[in-house]
């Protein structure tokens, strides 16, 4: 199996057991005929644990500041809960899933975004560990935690991590599964395909707004770096016959 797809499972989908179970069933089936790398975040679980431990988040320009206490909760939520749930679900469905994070085997090296605390931006993907897993017919399930060159643990945006891994492995496809069905035009219809040259004008005329802007820009960067297609799709609709918006060159 030479074809590789990287799938990013949106944290919000973990709140929908039906969608999550359907996704895990389908991903198991797909993993029988092609290589899969699954990357995940876990915003809702992080928020729930922060509330449980009475840790108040502060935000810088709309982004969560990750102090030492918050980082411990982030790692507990992502590696200790979400990763375990997804890995166990895949195994129950028959997949050879292995749960890791970006820090394991120094798989993802990042640099600190200092104004956000213990938050990292991926700068290098070391393929060795993930390659071993894939070649041994395992399905890596990767939590969005990484480390800098000195081994300091960092919270990493899961979208960015998935894109970095997809580019490093020259994946045929990168799929962002979210709680929205894709990118919509001003008539509320899904835009089926966006060329990267069209993105700036879609942002300028406010077709693409809010949190979709950084996601689309990240998709465009991935395509510029060699990916053939990047999808933004609704997780609840499944991935066997994926429907959503595809970004191409």
From Swiss-Prot:
Keywords recorded for this protein, A-Z: Amino-acid biosynthesis, Arginine biosynthesis, ATP-binding, Cytoplasm, Kinase, Nucleotide-binding, Transferase
Lineage: superkingdom: Bacteria
Residues where substrate binds: 42-43, 64, 155
Enzyme Commission no: 2.7.2.8
Biological process terms in GO annotation: arginine biosynthetic process via ornithine; L-arginine biosynthetic process
NCBIfam families linked: argB
Protein name: Acetylglutamate kinase
